Amino acid sequence: MQNPRFLDRTTPPKIVTLILVAGLSALTMNIFLPSLPGMALYYDVSYGVMQQSVALYLALSAALQIIIGPISDRYGRRKVLLGSLVLFLLATIGTLLAPTATSFLIFRMAQAVIAAGMVLSRAVVRDMVADAQAASMIGYVTMGMSLVPMIGPVIGGVLDDLYGWKANFALLLVLGLGTLALVWADLGETASLRRVSLAEQIRTYPALLASRRFWGYTLAAAFASGCFFAYLGGAPYVGDKIYGLSSTHVGALFALTAIGYAAGNFFAGRYSIRIGMNRMILIGCIVTTVGMALLALLTLLGLSGPTTFFGLTIFMGLGNGICLPNANAGLLSVRPELAGTASGLGGAILIGGGAALAAFAGVLLGPGSTEMPLILLMLASSAASVVAILFVIRRARQIGAA
């Protein structure tokens, strides 16, 4: 494969392009979170209704990831990503013009097409390098990517306080246009195109689903990130209704998780080859679980508050930053020739589980509730991730895999 040359669409992309593509996908998920209570007032609906803009977005992202992978294996990463960006821009315009909560939710769901950025940035990395190298490169890519959502809620909260919630979606529109131009100029095709039909590619799913290691890696990633998705679904309510914080304050506190995630990504990028994928995943899952257990204990002891609740989520970010690059590389390595399909299917399971947990978090929180139900949900999800990766390690020893 040719060496990447910046702004040359005949060669593979530079890392910065993959960072920005994946970053836009992540930013779309969280920039508007501090605005959720205000959006509920704007449309005169309950917080639970507007919170579904998170859960429904994640659910459609999961569905799309099932087909994005196989389509990109057949038609190429470049064409699929460019088409997805165009559709994302149209959906974003729709969110700005939506007159009702229902129409907003429809366009918000359509924005989920940007999930192609997450799927294909990982698949492009796997096209270019293999195994532990892929884990290391994904670690560096997601470390850079995490800088975008790190400041996203902060910017979103400030924009909401100054100009209203629509300013967040206007910013996404501008960034989407810039990303489209960059992808057009820099992302050359990296996939070895497979001249088979989409139906034939989907029929390869059983080969992946029959792999215990694929399930182990996928569930480890799903439960580890599920802790974070539950947090996304419930933290805006906790910050606004329980702690009485402003949108700007909530957005700033969201950055703590992202700081931990960036640190975890750096650790993954630096040490994945030396320590190994499976042990790195286990370390990440344990870090998250210990952090959530400490948060639950302090809350039970009556030491709850914004500092405790938001501060300890830095461990969740750190653990996810270590776990996810390695878990993603692991599920892609099970069948390397199906990297795009594995990325899409694994991502669908991961995001689908996240959608369910985000929706459940919204159900748990309501008038008179405390933060404890959300904390216990996050703890249960992180503990399940430890069980999943221990299964992978046991299975790897049985078959002699690395």
Regions found by a protein language model. Give the residues of each.
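Conserved MFS/SLC helix-loop-helix module at the cytosolic interface between two early adjacent transmembrane helices
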Residues: 63-101
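Cytoplasmic helix-loop-helix junction between adjacent transmembrane helices
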Residues: 107-144
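Juxtamembrane intracellular "pre-TM" segments in multi-pass secondary transporters
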Residues: 2-8, 188-218
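A late C-terminal transmembrane helix in Major Facilitator Superfamily
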Residues: 328, 332-368, 378
